[in-house]
Amino acid sequence: SYMPHYEQIVLRINPKEASQFDLVIVRGSRVYTSNRDRPMPQTPPPFAMVLRKYLKNARMTAVRQLGFDRVLALDFDTKFGAMHLYVEVFREGNIILVDDEGIIIQPLTHAKYSGRVLKKGVQYAPPPPANDPHDLDEAALSEIFAKSERDLVATLGGKANLGGTHANAVCELAKIAPNSAPGDVKVKLVHEALSSLLGSLANDAKGYLILDTEGDQTPEPVSYTHLRAHETG
């Protein structure tokens, strides 16, 4: 384990039948693999030393996502028993090493949020679970719409956790204007469009590179109808 700088952690992965690579974790931002050499500090930070102590020669057994949240759990089999490294990939997120009973061994930073505390020796509590669009039925959508003060596309993107691109795709499939008031739309049409989109993502996903009018590139898993004006084949 290395920390090139305070909010970046590098785990050296050595697969049995492949070349080694680095798993790079940037606090609150992203997780990716890399083969690039990085300058490392001569004196490892305390959190890096903790990771080395507990994860040295450990075997990674699983990588999991907690529900629909932007939280990854890296599971390890170590000489100390099962360990878990939780990576919170959202603004003000943390990186937390936890034992098999859920007790925090060490967080990257000690923090206190509404409803949870991240510090050594306490039970790890993930953030409150986000809405999973796969679990939203018509009744749940109706409740979300009734409480929303934003337009339809913003409500779907935020409260239903679809994000902007997928929220616009649902509006297009439902043939409803994105700026419609949620209370004025037929929930059944929105739910049918949402189910159709999620089905496409699960079963028909292909890679597309979509160019906007200024030439910027955005990778997407399916070809959305509201973006087809920019498709080049």
Predicted segments with their positions:
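A short, hydrophobic C-terminal helix/tail in secreted or cell-surface proteins
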Residues: 229-233
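Extended, highly charged segments
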Residues: 1-228
